[in-house]
UniProtKB/Swiss-Prot annotation:
The keyword Ribonucleoprotein does not apply. This is Histone H2A.Z. It comes from Schizosaccharomyces pombe (strain 972 / ATCC 24843). Acetylated at the N-terminus. N-terminal acetylation is essential for function. The lineage of its organism: Eukaryota, Fungi, Dikarya, Ascomycota, Taphrinomycotina. The nucleosome is a histone octamer containing two molecules each of H2A, H2B, H3 and H4 assembled in one H3-H4 heterotetramer and two H2A-H2B heterodimers. The octamer wraps approximately 147 bp of DNA. H2A or its variant H2A.Z forms a heterodimer with H2B. Component of the SWR1 and INO80 chromatin-remodeling complexes.
Length: 139
């Protein structure tokens, strides 16, 4: 009954030890959801003259991207919740980004299917009689 084939091989250097930690991704080490390795690859591809890219720069860039994405998704989720729907659409993204002053200056892109912000000029609004009683006397 020698180990002829179907069982798990336990011997050698690759045996499981209690204190041994397996491979961890750069994202897991940094506690991020965004892929640090992919961000590093993109940074290396976009640099000129084959300049080197530090490991911490990719982690920092991934953290910034993750924070901005979470911020936009939170605001868009609030906009969707206000409209009593469960799915975030480009319209909700548009309302969230244009509603926040800092995100509006950061993201100046046109969002396809986002529509426009609702705005009515004050001069076009109908004046009520309580606010302007002197007009009532003239008429």
């Amino acid at each position: 009954m020698s180990g002829g084939g179907k069982g798990k091989h336990v011997g050698g250097k690759g045996g499981s030890k209690i204190g041994e930690r397996g491979q961890m991704s750069h994202s897991a080490r940094a506690g991020l959801q965004f892929p640090v390795g992919r961000v590093r690859r993109f940074l290396k591809a976009k640099t000129q003259n084959n300049m080197r890219v530090g490991a911490k720069s990719a982690v920092y860039s991934a953290a910034v991207l993750e924070y901005l994405t979470a911020e936009v998704l939170e605001l868009a989720g609030n906009a969707a919740k206000d409209l009593k729907v469960k799915r975030i659409t480009p319209r909700h993204l548009q309302l969230a980004i244009r509603g926040d002053e800092e995100l509006d200056t950061l993201i100046r892109a046109t969002i396809a299917g986002g529509g426009v912000l609702p705005h009515i000029n004050k001069q076009l609004l109908i004046r009520t009689k309580e606010k302007y009683p002197e007009e009532e006397e003239i008429i």
